[in-house]
Amino acid sequence: MTKHSQKQNRQKQTTQKQTRRKKPAGKLKAKSEAKLDTRGKPETTEKKGLHERNLHRDGYDFEQLIEASPALKPYVRPNPYGNLSIDFADPLAVKALNLALLQLHYRIEYWDIPAGFLCPPIPGRVDYLHYIADLLAGIDSDTVGDKAEEQVEEIGTRQNVPYASKPESSAPKQRYKSQKRMKINALDIGTGANGIYPILGIQAYGWRFVASDVDPLSIENVNRIVGQNKALQGKLKTRLQTDHQKVFHGIIQADDRFDITLCNPPFHASLSEASEGSLRKVKNLAANRAAKGHKPEPAASKAKPDANELNFGGQKAELWCEGGEKQFLANMIRESKDFATQCLWFTSLVSKKENLQPCYAALEKVGAVTVKTIDMAQGNKLTRVLAWSYLTPKQQALWAKYRS
């Protein structure tokens, strides 16, 4: 064999080894995007289900739910596949399901909302909390396994509370010894009448909350819920936002220090747009039920109010604002700069993917040091959490040590 032929063979073997070692470009790109955390433009890797610690990943155990909350029973019946379910287009059924979930999994004794206010889906709401718990624990959004559970478990350990979100038990009784470390202080912007984020955050992680809203009726109802649940008392405070044009101003006080802020911003830009969206959801649910061969509604649901009044309803502040989600996020980012040293992490849900780029530009303009985008998925619905901090990594590390 000539020297030229030997050289060609060596080159061929080297190329084959490199080919075997090389990972698909798409996976490499997705992984790098998932870890991007400064001025981060791309999104994280796509997720196809609820968070690994979400108790509702495998659906609902309706027999247990009925046992915990008998008021749910009239709304439960077998679906065409023989599994127990409810009519998710029926607002009374959804409301009864929410109460049962809160009673069974989150040790809430009383929960109710007035007619016309949003009735939130609990699995999706608690998912947001699980992902920001990971954020506080310093876990990348696509981390899975024991390491993630151990680190987030430590958050519960610090606060001497039951860890309600461990997947192996729906109502764990174990309490963790307090290590006399920091307790998580959270701020919920636009809590609504349901107060669902503070309720879940307190019961799943032992966090303490300040919940704000522009609607006095929402604040009144959340206060009523707190008054009827000893588990929430002393852990949830409400503040009324009197200036509808403000987000943080008028809510964050001079001596406040928040580890995390969260928000589910108004989605629509007008009342007509919100109404169209609600009607579209109702029609889609009805079509889906018909396609699956569901039978007519039982007596318990015949007297139900219009579907827009509860599960796809909502007051003005809950569903829409001038400029819609894009403008609300712009206002939030701009105001967050004024409280840069009072909050470790600012976060918000972003429903419309096209609103991310304007947010990135706004965050760069105000000088955010770290920006993260965390994808979430509930069934076919995709959304994401946008998180940003004005503190350097060193300042973030010192945060827990020096804040009161």
UniProtKB/Swiss-Prot annotation:
Bias-annotated ranges (Polar residues): 157-172
Task: Give GO BP annotations, semicolon-separated.
Answer: rRNA base methylation
Location of this chain's protein in the cell: Cytoplasm
Pfam family membership, one: Methyltransf_10
Any idea of its EC number? 2.1.1.181
Q: Which UniProt keywords apply?
A: Cytoplasm, Methyltransferase, rRNA processing, S-adenosyl-L-methionine, Transferase
Spell out the Basic and acidic residues composition-biased ranges: 30-54
What is the main EC category here? Answer: transferase
Q: Looking at the keywords, is Kinase present? A: no
Annotated Gene Ontology cellular component terms: cytoplasm
Mind telling me which SUPFAM superfamilies this protein's record contains? S-adenosyl-L-methionine-dependent methyltransferases
Residue segments, region Disordered: 1-54, 156-177, 289-308
| Entry function | Specifically methylates the adenine in position 1618 of 23S rRNA.
Task: Give the family per the record.
Answer: Belongs to the methyltransferase superfamily. METTL16/RlmF family.
Q: What is this protein called?
A: Ribosomal RNA large subunit methyltransferase F
Q: Which organism is it from?
A: Shewanella sediminis (strain HAW-EB3)
Underlying gene: rlmF
